[in-house]
Design a protein with these regions (language model features):
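Amphipathic terminal alpha-helices
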Residues: 283-304
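Conserved Rossmann-fold NAD(P)-dependent oxidoreductase catalytic core, especially the SDR/UDP-sugar
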Residues: 88-132
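Glycine/proline-rich active-site loop of Rossmann-fold NAD(P)-dependent oxidoreductases
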Residues: 137, 161-173, 206-216, 222
């Protein structure tokens, strides 16, 4: 398949790119720097130098693909507007050339849009986003409602992604090596977790299977608590780090709405993803700490 990918150098997008290349798909990626262009071209990727903020930089280049994967995430104050314009641009590009089979558009959301819930939540659960991502469900619906005979659309909601040297779990590993891990709240809340290579496999399945439309959850369904994650990390440190539980109100003073996201208590199920034949290969952070520490260290060395 010919696939247009945004976020190819990001934490999720880079894993998706790896999975697409392993499956021998032809990938065109939107990247922001000449250095990224050179790195991707060396891997056989067609790179488009541009930016989500500048629609003209990629609008024409995005026309005529079999699938579009939007994995980029802007962190600026204008992230809602930038994301909305990117969705509109990719949908327009997908509709530019009629063809069979119909192209697909896969949008990256996240399980935080569900909010906290004591009962397990599957893909049919109502959204209840906090302040941090209050705009995201509307963007999900924009994508889903665009589905037609000429466009297949899907939304993937990753849980907290781990693996490599980026992301929330990697921050815990890094803090553990420095001797202090801070936990927002009492740590008894459950995090929905997913290994980044397993997440990338789901993207490939959704992109390549004709029934891949609608909402898909991406997590291991293991309901691991933050305390269990931290204890697993602590037990594999040469020098046992201190673990400090920070009250949510105190966490908000430094992290704002991000503290509330970290304190969410979520038990999540992914039946629609499993129906595609998808199954995570790694389960729980605490049972995979040695592997994750090695990945973290290798990633740090490459980044140095």
């Amino acid at each position: 398949m010919r696939i247009f990918l945004t976020g190819a150098t990001g934490y999720i997008g880079s894993a998706v790119l790896d999975a697409l290349l392993r499956a021998n798909h032809q990938v065109t990626a939107l990247v922001r720097t000449p250095q990224a262009v050179d790195a991707l071209v060396a891997r056989g990727v067609t790179a488009v130098l541009g930016d989500l903020k500048m629609i003209k930089s990629y609008r024409t280049a995005a026309e005529g693909f079999d699938a579009y994967i939007h994995a980029a995430a802007d962190a600026s104050a204008k992230r809602e507007e930038i994301d909305r314009r990117a969705i509109d641009t990719l949908m327009t590009a997908a509709a530019a050339r009629a063809r069979t089979p119909s192209p697909s558009l896969i949008y990256t959301s996240g399980l935080w849009v569900l909010g906290s819930n004591a009962q397990p939540m599957d893909e049919t659960a109502q959204t209840n986003p906090g302040q941090l991502l209050g705009w995201r469900p509307a963007h999900e619906q924009l994508v889903l409602q665009a589905a037609s005979a000429s466009l297949r659309t899907a939304v993937i909601r990753p849980g907290i992604v781990y693996g490599g040297n980026r992301g929330i779990v990697s921050d815990l590993l890094k803090n553990g090596t420095k001797g202090l891990i801070r936990v927002i709240g009492n740590g008894e809340n459950h995090w929905p977790l997913i290994y980044r290579r397993d997440l990338a496999d789901l993207y490939v399945r959704v992109a390549t299977q004709s029934q891949g439309s609608g909402i898909y959850h991406a997590n291991d369904e293991c309901d691991e608590t933050v305390n269990a994650i931290v204890e697993g990390i602590v037990n594999h440190m040469t020098m046992r780090p201190e673990v400090r539980h920070v009250p949510l109100e105190e966490g908000r003073k430094k992290l704002g709405a991000y503290a509330d996201a970290l304190a969410l208590d979520q038990r999540v199920r992914a039946p629609r993803s499993r129906a595609l034949g998808w199954s995570p290969t790694l389960h729980t952070v605490s049972s995979n700490v040695p592997r994750l520490l090695e990945e973290f260290r290798r990633g740090q060395e490459r980044a140095a």
